[in-house]
Amino acid sequence: LGFLFLIAALIMNYFGFRNVRKLRGPRRRIPRAPSGPKYRKRVKSDLPRRGRRVSGRGNAKYVFAPISLITIGLLGGCTTTQSVNTTEQATKYPQLQVVITDNQLQRIVGDLATKVKAADTARDVIELQQRVTGPALEIRKVNYLLQGKSKKIKPLRDIVANPITVALPMQISADETDWQPRTLMLVTKSPNSKIGPQLMVLQQASPRENYKLWYLIDLLPGNAFPKVAVQDIGTLTVAADNAFLATKLSSLPYKYGNILNNGAESKYARYFNLSSDGFYEARFADQSKQAKTLKKVKATIKFLHKLGDPNIIGMLTLKSGGLIAVSMTDTSIIKPTTRGSAVSVTEKEQKLLLNSRGSSTGLKIKYENMLLFYVPVSGSNEKIRLLGASQGILSVKALK
């Protein structure tokens, strides 16, 4: 369309130019004077047609002005249209939306709490698997087993559905074509003031499946929870192999475990904020005490810490850091140092799982830890912080 306007403008200019030529009239050559053969300079009085030329040029200006304005207007119209289209294309950003509404969130959490409570009451693993998976499932399965062996074993803490103090749903594109698992993090507060808040991490693996609980983590006192987006906006998930956070996420259990073994002397201690980490303080003290006690009875103990379930789940905070839920498996290997001696277990759960008081060959004890870390963005002055932790025993076996 702009090209047609340009052609029309050129045609109008052409006819305008022809009109000017007609108004100017014919060009005349001034004759020489008959008085002599010499050529003399022409003066203004010898140019009788100049007055008409000036008049003609005045008309030319009158003709050209509207034609030029029309041309500029037509071309300007073409240019404006093109500019608007370009701007519209440049500012077209992908529309984001959250995976669930507030009503859906309340229904999901309420149903989860009800179903898990029913499974806990009946100690029904099959029913539990309908709504719980991963590390949270493994810890509860062992608890059901222990409850079946002894009435002295207490059930695990109930899931608190309300009130929800933090809800962080995953963002997705409104134009999403390939379905991806949905993730949801939320914090609930118990009506019992003696019980701290708990963080739940849920995922929906496919459109036909329910949201399942992967992590149920007790938040530690004295740690400020990072600022996160409001529920209506949500946030993006953090890939386990991302390169913009301060550490590789799969290495968190190993590095933190090294700190549990070596304390402030660990080479990784400077990357973690340990000043308000009550979990670290209790575990480091407990491991040191066990090592000293076993040394007195001529036995050794070795503590190993590694990544448990490979499903590391992370979500971005407002400062571009990450809330990272990760599984850490602790393995304690105890061996007697003298022939004919044996090592014994003292905890109730360990005795029930071993079906014995000890072993002459040694013991292998495994625990599952569900941990929540705040990992700052790479290059930040902030340190990695442990925000929450929950632990449960998995197994006790005699060494062969």
Regions from the PLM with identified roles:
Residues S150-P197, A299-G340:
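Surface-exposed, charged secondary-structure patches
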Residues K92-S150, K227-T300:
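Core segments of small alpha/beta cavity-forming domains
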Residues T79-Q82:
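Bacterial signal peptide processing site
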Residues K22-T71:
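Cytoplasmic C-terminal tails of single-pass
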Residues L1, Q89-P94:
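Membrane interfacial helix motifs at helix-loop boundaries and amphipathic/re-entrant anchors
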